[in-house]
Amino acid sequence: HASSGVAALAGAIFLGRRKKSTIDAEPANIPFVLLGAALLWLGWFGFNAGSSLHADGTAVKAFLNTNTASATAMMTWIFFDCLRGRKPSAMGAAVGCVVGLVAITPSAGYVTVGQSIFISFVITIICNIAVYWRSHSRIDDALDVFPTHGTGGIFGTVLTGIFIQGGLISGTWAGFIVFLYHILAVVI
């Protein structure tokens, strides 16, 4: 997700802004956006839980963390929009859902449910701020791919290095080395 988000940012910068008439266009069909988000959420279970290639505890943990993180992110996005004086919306709920899926993907099978709630909560706030920043910048990323996928993927990878078993949170030198590998992966 980090690489696709950064590629989208590079593409948006390279292509420049759209014509003014298409920039302020409202979403055409909100029910289809919600249907798409629901189908993404459903498909993501196979993506995260199926990545273990076994029907074991890791797959169950990935499944549970995927659902928990997405639900947490959806509610966090709506709540943060309300805190910032914006009206809660179905579009915001759909974006929050996708941000939660992106945020938990690197660590879905390797963190506890409580950690997945924390990860998705923090990353959702960061992505919400990134979407706000993008909307006030000269970058024309029509689908907010960088603020959601790029930012969520980058911080999801960093937080994975902190929270996985044997990661930075373990307090050992080996955990510090694991965390540095995650930082290096983000930079590269």
Residue ranges with predicted function:
Residues 2-188:
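Hydrophobic alpha-helical transmembrane bundles of multi-pass membrane proteins
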